[in-house]
């Protein structure tokens, strides 16, 4: 069994997986780094819920874009599971014949995991993969599995927090779905601005990218804010909320030469 760990700027995901199935995922906030012992407390809860044994865990793969949290995750793996974990990085793209044609190969490990999963789930397609996390990252992958371009924009939570941070009187609001656009109180007006502003930004960016690329792009959304698009008919073809974890699982199977690769 695999423990897949996705460390993002806003949340950490712990997932317990078999070779072809994600059994359980929990999310915790990542704003403040914790100790290996504290992270084990959360992970131990999942293992107990699944009624499985620690001995069944034979691999741990970590995708992390927060260096300060990577260290306790390494300690967690070694101290509690006696496993030297695999740290997902750009070198793993070669295993899947994925080429990174970006300056300085500037691609986060979470986004690479997304691309690994998307290229396996939707093969032989020109893909636009949108990671809707702390930042909103649009990555382009062609049929030849070359990552050749990207757009990076603020995430919905950054939009919400920035209004409070850079103004004297505006309150802090949450990111939440809104049925209407115009409101008569400041809280709902701000929530509407964040929600509909984010929806409009993403839809507009997709439209501009497709127009500029002049090709039929299969559009996939993933990440913590992708749920905002569940009720909207947009150019997004598929919403894959756990694409990063699936990418880590594909890597696990590839490194293990596991025949379950195509059934995730």
Curated annotation (Swiss-Prot):
Keyword Cytoplasm: yes
Predominant subcellular localization, coarse grouping: cytoplasm
Binding site for ATP: 6-13, 134
Pathway(s) where this gene product acts: Cofactor biosynthesis; coenzyme A biosynthesis; CoA from (R)-pantothenate: step 1/5
Superkingdom, natural source: Bacteria
Residues of the active site: 110
Gene Ontology MF: a single term: pantothenate kinase activity
Keyword Transmembrane helix assigned: no
SUPFAM superfamilies in alphabetical order: Actin-like ATPase domain
Co-factor remark: A monovalent cation. Ammonium or potassium.
Cofactor(s) listed: NH4(+); K(+)
Entry EC no(s): 2.7.1.33
Entry's localization field: Cytoplasm
Keyword set, alphabetical order: ATP-binding, Coenzyme A biosynthesis, Cytoplasm, Kinase, Nucleotide-binding, Potassium, Transferase
Reactions it catalyzes: (R)-pantothenate + ATP = (R)-4'-phosphopantothenate + ADP + H(+)
GO cellular component: cytoplasm
UniProt binding sites for substrate: 108-111
GO term, biological process aspect, one: coenzyme A biosynthetic process
Enzyme type, top EC level: transferase
Record's function text: Catalyzes the phosphorylation of pantothenate (Pan), the first step in CoA biosynthesis.
Similarity comment: family membership: Belongs to the type III pantothenate kinase family.
Quaternary structure note: Homodimer.
The protein's name: Type III pantothenate kinase
Origin species: Ehrlichia canis (strain Jake)
Annotated gene: coaX
């Amino acid at each position: 069994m695999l423990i897949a760990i996705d460390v993002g700027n806003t949340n950490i995901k712990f997932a317990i997986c078999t070779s072809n199935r994600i059994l359980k995922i929990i999310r915790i906030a990542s704003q403040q780094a914790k100790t290996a012992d504290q992270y084990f407390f959360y992970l131990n809860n999942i293992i107990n819920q699944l009624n499985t044994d620690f001995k069944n865990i034979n691999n741990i793969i970590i995708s992390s874009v927060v260096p300060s949290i990577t260290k306790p995750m390494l300690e967690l793996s070694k101290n509690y599971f006696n496993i030297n974990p695999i740290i997902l990085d750009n070198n793993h793209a070669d295993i899947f014949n994925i080429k990174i044609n970006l300056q300085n190969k500037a691609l986060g490990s979470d986004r690479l995991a997304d691309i690994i999963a998307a290229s396996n789930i939707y093969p032989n397609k020109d893909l636009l993969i949108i990671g809707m996390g702390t930042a909103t990252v649009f990555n382009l992958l062609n049929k030849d599995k070359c990552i050749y371009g990207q757009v990076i924009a603020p995430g919905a939570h950054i939009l919400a927090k920035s209004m409070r941070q850079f103004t004297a009187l505006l309150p802090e609001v949450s990111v939440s779905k809104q049925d209407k656009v115009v409101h008569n109180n400041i809280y709902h007006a701000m929530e509407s601005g964040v929600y509909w502003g984010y929806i409009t930004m993403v839809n507009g960016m997709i439209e501009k990218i497709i127009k500029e690329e002049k090709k039929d792009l299969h559009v996939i959304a993933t990440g913590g804010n992708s749920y905002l698009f569940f009720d909207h008919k947009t150019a997004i073809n598929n919403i894959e909320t756990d694409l990063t974890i699936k990418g880590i699982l594909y890597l696990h199977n590839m490194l293990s030469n596991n025949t379950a690769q195509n059934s995730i």
